[in-house]
Protein backbone atom coordinates (compact mmCIF):
# COMPACT_ATOMS: atom_id res chain seq x y z
CA UNK A 1 0.00 0.00 0.00
CA UNK A 2 1.33 3.45 -0.97
CA UNK A 3 1.33 5.77 2.02
CA UNK A 4 0.25 9.37 1.22
CA UNK A 5 3.23 10.83 3.04
CA UNK A 6 5.49 13.63 1.84
CA UNK A 7 9.23 13.22 2.23
CA UNK A 8 12.03 15.74 2.21
CA UNK A 9 15.24 15.08 0.33
CA UNK A 10 18.02 13.90 2.64
CA UNK A 11 20.69 13.64 -0.03
CA UNK A 12 22.60 16.91 0.26
CA UNK A 13 21.97 20.70 0.33
CA UNK A 14 23.03 20.91 -3.32
CA UNK A 15 20.51 18.32 -4.49
CA UNK A 16 18.29 19.60 -7.31
CA UNK A 17 15.10 18.27 -5.75
CA UNK A 18 15.11 20.30 -2.53
CA UNK A 19 11.76 21.91 -3.39
CA UNK A 20 9.77 18.73 -2.96
CA UNK A 21 8.99 15.59 -4.91
CA UNK A 22 6.31 14.24 -7.16
CA UNK A 23 3.55 12.33 -5.48
CA UNK A 24 4.40 8.64 -5.11
CA UNK A 25 1.23 7.65 -6.94
CA UNK A 26 2.34 9.68 -9.96
CA UNK A 27 5.75 8.00 -10.04
CA UNK A 28 4.07 4.63 -9.66
CA UNK A 29 1.88 5.26 -12.71
CA UNK A 30 4.86 6.47 -14.75
CA UNK A 31 6.92 3.36 -14.05
CA UNK A 32 3.92 1.11 -14.55
CA UNK A 33 3.63 2.59 -18.04
CA UNK A 34 7.36 1.89 -18.51
CA UNK A 35 6.76 -1.74 -17.46
CA UNK A 36 9.05 -1.30 -14.43
CA UNK A 37 12.14 -0.96 -16.62
CA UNK A 38 15.02 -1.99 -14.30
CA UNK A 39 17.56 0.31 -15.96
CA UNK A 40 15.30 3.32 -15.41
CA UNK A 41 14.57 2.25 -11.83
CA UNK A 42 18.31 2.03 -11.16
CA UNK A 43 18.84 5.44 -12.77
CA UNK A 44 16.14 7.01 -10.62
CA UNK A 45 17.75 5.53 -7.50
CA UNK A 46 20.90 7.52 -8.23
CA UNK A 47 19.11 10.88 -8.11
CA UNK A 48 18.86 11.17 -4.33
CA UNK A 49 18.12 9.17 -1.21
CA UNK A 50 14.40 9.89 -1.38
CA UNK A 51 14.12 8.35 -4.84
CA UNK A 52 16.40 5.49 -3.77
CA UNK A 53 14.15 4.74 -0.80
CA UNK A 54 11.04 4.87 -2.99
CA UNK A 55 12.64 2.53 -5.52
CA UNK A 56 13.60 0.01 -2.83
CA UNK A 57 10.18 0.09 -1.15
CA UNK A 58 7.92 0.19 -4.18
CA UNK A 59 9.46 0.03 -7.65
CA UNK A 60 11.71 -3.00 -7.20
CA UNK A 61 8.86 -4.82 -5.49
CA UNK A 62 6.53 -4.17 -8.43
CA UNK A 63 9.29 -5.18 -10.85
CA UNK A 64 9.72 -8.54 -9.08
CA UNK A 65 5.97 -9.16 -8.93
CA UNK A 66 5.65 -8.44 -12.64
CA UNK A 67 8.70 -10.46 -13.72
CA UNK A 68 7.92 -13.59 -11.65
CA UNK A 69 4.36 -13.30 -10.27
CA UNK A 70 3.81 -16.91 -9.15
CA UNK A 71 7.21 -17.13 -7.52
CA UNK A 72 6.70 -13.84 -5.65
CA UNK A 73 3.25 -14.93 -4.50
CA UNK A 74 4.73 -18.11 -3.06
CA UNK A 75 7.66 -16.32 -1.41
CA UNK A 76 5.24 -14.02 0.40
CA UNK A 77 2.66 -16.65 1.32
CA UNK A 78 2.09 -18.00 4.84
CA UNK A 79 2.85 -14.62 6.34
CA UNK A 80 6.45 -14.70 5.12
CA UNK A 81 8.01 -11.26 4.83
CA UNK A 82 11.64 -12.34 4.61
CA UNK A 83 12.18 -10.44 1.37
CA UNK A 84 10.82 -7.14 2.67
CA UNK A 85 13.66 -4.65 2.49
CA UNK A 86 15.51 -6.81 -0.05
CA UNK A 87 13.44 -6.21 -3.16
CA UNK A 88 16.31 -4.52 -4.98
CA UNK A 89 18.60 -7.48 -4.28
CA UNK A 90 15.92 -9.91 -5.44
CA UNK A 91 15.29 -7.85 -8.57
CA UNK A 92 19.00 -7.98 -9.38
CA UNK A 93 19.07 -11.74 -8.79
CA UNK A 94 16.24 -12.23 -11.29
CA UNK A 95 18.05 -10.56 -14.17
CA UNK A 96 21.77 -10.60 -13.38
CA UNK A 97 24.36 -13.40 -13.55
CA UNK A 98 27.18 -12.39 -11.20
CA UNK A 99 29.90 -14.29 -13.11
CA UNK A 100 33.08 -15.39 -11.33
CA UNK A 101 36.60 -14.10 -10.81
CA UNK A 102 39.91 -15.91 -10.85
CA UNK A 103 40.65 -17.21 -7.37
CA UNK A 104 37.45 -15.63 -6.06
CA UNK A 105 34.44 -17.20 -4.41
CA UNK A 106 34.53 -20.38 -6.51
CA UNK A 107 38.33 -20.64 -6.62
CA UNK A 108 38.04 -20.72 -10.41
CA UNK A 109 40.87 -20.36 -12.90
CA UNK A 110 38.69 -18.44 -15.37
CA UNK A 111 37.34 -14.91 -15.41
CA UNK A 112 33.66 -14.61 -16.32
CA UNK A 113 32.29 -11.06 -16.07
CA UNK A 114 28.85 -10.45 -14.63
CA UNK A 115 26.11 -9.70 -17.14
CA UNK A 116 22.38 -9.15 -17.46
CA UNK A 117 20.24 -12.09 -18.57
CA UNK A 118 17.39 -11.29 -20.91
CA UNK A 119 15.16 -14.18 -19.87
CA UNK A 120 15.49 -16.61 -16.95
CA UNK A 121 13.27 -19.40 -15.68
CA UNK A 122 13.29 -20.17 -11.95
CA UNK A 123 12.14 -23.65 -10.96
CA UNK A 124 11.03 -24.95 -7.59
CA UNK A 125 11.53 -28.52 -8.82
CA UNK A 126 15.14 -27.83 -9.77
CA UNK A 127 15.69 -26.18 -6.40
CA UNK A 128 14.39 -29.26 -4.60
CA UNK A 129 16.94 -31.46 -6.37
CA UNK A 130 19.73 -29.26 -4.99
CA UNK A 131 18.66 -29.94 -1.40
CA UNK A 132 19.65 -32.96 0.72
CA UNK A 133 16.84 -35.43 1.52
CA UNK A 134 16.46 -34.20 5.09
CA UNK A 135 15.87 -30.62 3.87
CA UNK A 136 13.50 -31.16 0.96
CA UNK A 137 10.55 -29.63 2.74
CA UNK A 138 12.34 -26.29 2.28
CA UNK A 139 11.32 -24.22 -0.72
CA UNK A 140 14.14 -23.16 -3.04
CA UNK A 141 13.76 -21.57 -6.46
CA UNK A 142 16.76 -21.99 -8.79
CA UNK A 143 17.32 -20.85 -12.37
CA UNK A 144 18.68 -23.01 -15.15
CA UNK A 145 22.48 -22.71 -15.39
CA UNK A 146 23.73 -19.74 -17.38
CA UNK A 147 26.06 -21.43 -19.86
CA UNK A 148 29.56 -20.10 -20.49
CA UNK A 149 31.08 -22.47 -23.02
CA UNK A 150 34.68 -23.34 -23.89
CA UNK A 151 36.35 -21.92 -20.79
CA UNK A 152 39.68 -23.64 -21.42
CA UNK A 153 40.59 -26.28 -18.86
CA UNK A 154 37.37 -25.53 -16.99
CA UNK A 155 35.33 -26.81 -19.93
CA UNK A 156 31.73 -25.62 -20.19
CA UNK A 157 30.90 -23.64 -17.06
CA UNK A 158 27.37 -23.21 -15.75
CA UNK A 159 26.49 -20.48 -13.25
CA UNK A 160 23.18 -20.63 -11.41
CA UNK A 161 21.42 -18.63 -8.73
CA UNK A 162 18.34 -18.95 -6.57
CA UNK A 163 16.32 -17.83 -3.55
CA UNK A 164 15.04 -19.67 -0.47
CA UNK A 165 11.57 -19.08 0.90
CA UNK A 166 11.67 -18.17 4.61
CA UNK A 167 15.36 -18.96 4.87
CA UNK A 168 15.65 -17.90 8.56
CA UNK A 169 13.35 -20.81 9.49
CA UNK A 170 14.62 -23.30 6.89
CA UNK A 171 16.11 -26.71 7.65
CA UNK A 172 19.15 -25.91 5.52
CA UNK A 173 20.04 -22.99 7.75
CA UNK A 174 19.52 -25.13 10.84
CA UNK A 175 21.84 -27.84 9.49
CA UNK A 176 24.52 -25.28 8.60
CA UNK A 177 24.38 -23.73 12.06
CA UNK A 178 24.39 -27.11 13.83
CA UNK A 179 27.52 -28.07 11.87
CA UNK A 180 29.15 -24.76 12.83
CA UNK A 181 30.08 -24.01 9.23
CA UNK A 182 32.09 -20.76 9.14
CA UNK A 183 31.33 -17.87 6.82
CA UNK A 184 33.50 -17.36 3.77
CA UNK A 185 36.47 -15.32 5.04
CA UNK A 186 36.40 -12.63 2.35
CA UNK A 187 33.61 -12.96 -0.23
CA UNK A 188 30.04 -11.69 0.22
CA UNK A 189 26.78 -12.12 -1.67
CA UNK A 190 26.92 -10.12 -4.93
CA UNK A 191 23.23 -9.29 -4.58
CA UNK A 192 22.86 -8.11 -0.98
CA UNK A 193 26.44 -8.03 0.41
CA UNK A 194 25.56 -10.50 3.19
CA UNK A 195 27.97 -13.16 4.43
CA UNK A 196 28.08 -16.55 2.72
CA UNK A 197 28.07 -20.20 3.80
CA UNK A 198 29.45 -22.98 1.61
CA UNK A 199 26.99 -25.83 1.17
CA UNK A 200 29.86 -28.00 -0.06
CA UNK A 201 31.67 -27.41 3.20
CA UNK A 202 28.45 -28.23 5.05
CA UNK A 203 28.34 -31.54 3.11
CA UNK A 204 24.74 -31.09 2.02
CA UNK A 205 25.08 -31.20 -1.78
CA UNK A 206 23.16 -34.31 -2.95
CA UNK A 207 24.02 -36.50 -5.93
CA UNK A 208 20.73 -35.48 -7.55
CA UNK A 209 22.18 -32.00 -8.09
CA UNK A 210 24.62 -33.10 -10.79
CA UNK A 211 21.90 -35.09 -12.56
CA UNK A 212 19.39 -32.25 -12.69
CA UNK A 213 22.00 -29.63 -13.61
CA UNK A 214 23.48 -32.02 -16.21
CA UNK A 215 26.90 -31.46 -14.69
CA UNK A 216 29.86 -33.61 -13.75
CA UNK A 217 29.77 -35.20 -10.32
CA UNK A 218 32.07 -33.52 -7.76
CA UNK A 219 32.23 -30.42 -9.99
CA UNK A 220 29.40 -28.53 -8.30
CA UNK A 221 29.68 -25.90 -5.61
CA UNK A 222 27.14 -23.44 -4.27
CA UNK A 223 26.83 -20.91 -1.49
CA UNK A 224 23.90 -19.43 0.40
CA UNK A 225 23.89 -16.04 2.10
CA UNK A 226 22.20 -14.91 5.30
CA UNK A 227 19.26 -13.58 3.27
CA UNK A 228 18.69 -16.87 1.46
CA UNK A 229 20.23 -15.99 -1.91
CA UNK A 230 21.96 -18.96 -3.51
CA UNK A 231 24.70 -18.82 -6.13
CA UNK A 232 26.66 -21.70 -7.59
CA UNK A 233 28.92 -23.04 -10.30
CA UNK A 234 29.21 -26.37 -12.10
CA UNK A 235 31.07 -27.96 -14.99
CA UNK A 236 28.45 -28.89 -17.57
CA UNK A 237 28.60 -32.32 -19.17
CA UNK A 238 28.37 -32.44 -22.98
CA UNK A 239 25.24 -33.78 -24.59
CA UNK A 240 25.54 -37.55 -25.01
CA UNK A 241 24.35 -39.68 -27.89
CA UNK A 242 21.24 -41.63 -27.04
CA UNK A 243 23.15 -44.91 -26.81
CA UNK A 244 25.63 -43.39 -24.35
CA UNK A 245 23.04 -41.98 -21.98
CA UNK A 246 22.79 -43.74 -18.64
CA UNK A 247 19.29 -43.78 -17.16
CA UNK A 248 19.16 -42.27 -13.70
CA UNK A 249 16.83 -42.97 -10.81
CA UNK A 250 14.70 -40.10 -12.09
CA UNK A 251 12.97 -41.39 -15.23
CA UNK A 252 12.81 -37.87 -16.64
CA UNK A 253 16.58 -37.41 -16.76
CA UNK A 254 19.69 -39.21 -17.93
CA UNK A 255 23.17 -39.15 -16.50
CA UNK A 256 25.97 -38.43 -18.96
CA UNK A 257 29.20 -40.44 -19.18
CA UNK A 258 32.18 -38.44 -18.02
CA UNK A 259 34.47 -39.81 -20.74
CA UNK A 260 32.21 -39.03 -23.68
CA UNK A 261 33.18 -36.00 -25.73
CA UNK A 262 35.09 -34.23 -22.97
CA UNK A 263 38.67 -34.90 -21.74
CA UNK A 264 38.54 -36.64 -18.39
CA UNK A 265 41.72 -34.92 -17.24
CA UNK A 266 39.89 -31.59 -17.42
CA UNK A 267 37.12 -33.03 -15.28
CA UNK A 268 39.68 -34.10 -12.70
CA UNK A 269 41.31 -30.67 -12.73
CA UNK A 270 37.94 -29.05 -12.14
CA UNK A 271 37.13 -31.48 -9.34
CA UNK A 272 40.51 -30.94 -7.70
CA UNK A 273 40.01 -27.18 -7.97
CA UNK A 274 36.87 -27.56 -5.90
CA UNK A 275 38.02 -30.25 -3.51
CA UNK A 276 41.80 -29.91 -3.44
CA UNK A 277 44.20 -32.86 -3.70
CA UNK A 278 45.59 -35.39 -6.16
CA UNK A 279 43.93 -37.01 -9.18
CA UNK A 280 42.35 -39.65 -7.03
CA UNK A 281 41.27 -36.81 -4.77
CA UNK A 282 39.88 -36.85 -1.27
CA UNK A 283 36.32 -37.95 -0.57
CA UNK A 284 33.63 -35.66 -2.02
CA UNK A 285 32.19 -32.76 -0.04
CA UNK A 286 35.53 -31.56 1.30
CA UNK A 287 36.06 -27.88 2.00
CA UNK A 288 37.34 -25.76 -0.87
CA UNK A 289 41.10 -25.25 -0.83
CA UNK A 290 43.55 -23.69 -3.23
CA UNK A 291 45.40 -26.53 -5.04
CA UNK A 292 48.45 -24.30 -5.42
CA UNK A 293 48.96 -23.98 -1.67
From Swiss-Prot:
Disulfide bond annotation, renumbered to this chain: none
Region (Disordered): 245-293
Domain of life: Eukaryota
Domain F-box: 16-68
Biased segments, Basic and acidic residues type: 250-259
Descriptive protein name: EID1-like F-box protein 1
Organism: Arabidopsis thaliana
Gene: EDL1
